A protein has these predicted regions:
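Active-site segments that bind and position negatively charged phosphate/pyrophosphate groups
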Residues: 1-86
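C-terminal charged capping/lid subdomain of soluble metabolic enzymes
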Residues: 75-139
Length: 139
């Protein structure tokens, strides 16, 4: 609730610009794609919407490429996915959706073949459902 200082605002704009340039060069992955509907239709801040899907996405990823997830967790300073998931819940809180919304958003994601193609392995509807189940509180 504090007022944003000019210095902090400048740093925020700089980091946002650098992040935008990185995304423009590398693209984004599944948590980012899953965040679109949650942000647009439910008003959840974009960063939070991306973050709530990270741990569950990494769980699905670990089923295919456990060594990659192990390296990610090590680089982030976490020993386990559970530790990482707990940390994300602590800083982001939870997001609640209705089952109707979840089903609609999953349907839309499955139609988004360009975003599904960013995943380094084939992502099934069941995988997306699992990610939602572990990331969202269904009302």
């Amino acid at each position: 609730d504090e007022e944003l200082s000019e210095e902090l605002a400048e740093k925020l704009m700089l980091t946002s610009t650098i992040a935008g340039m990185a995304i423009a060069q590398t693209g984004t992955s599944i948590p980012h794609a899953l965040s679109y509907d949650v942000t647009y239709h439910n008003g959840v801040a974009h960063g939070k919407a991306c973050g709530i899907f990270l741990a569950a996405y990494l769980r699905v990823y670990a089923e295919q490429k456990p060594e990659d997830v192990e390296e990610i967790l090590t680089l982030l300073g976490f020993k386990t996915l559970d530790d990482f998931a707990s940390y994300l819940t602590e800083i982001l809180g939870t997001v609640s959706l209705t089952q109707k919304e979840v089903t609609f958003y999953i349907d839309r994601m499955m139609e988004n073949t360009s975003k599904l193609a960013t995943c380094p392995f084939e992502l099934t509807r069941e995988d997306i459902e699992k990610i939602y189940r572990e990331s969202i509180v269904v009302e």
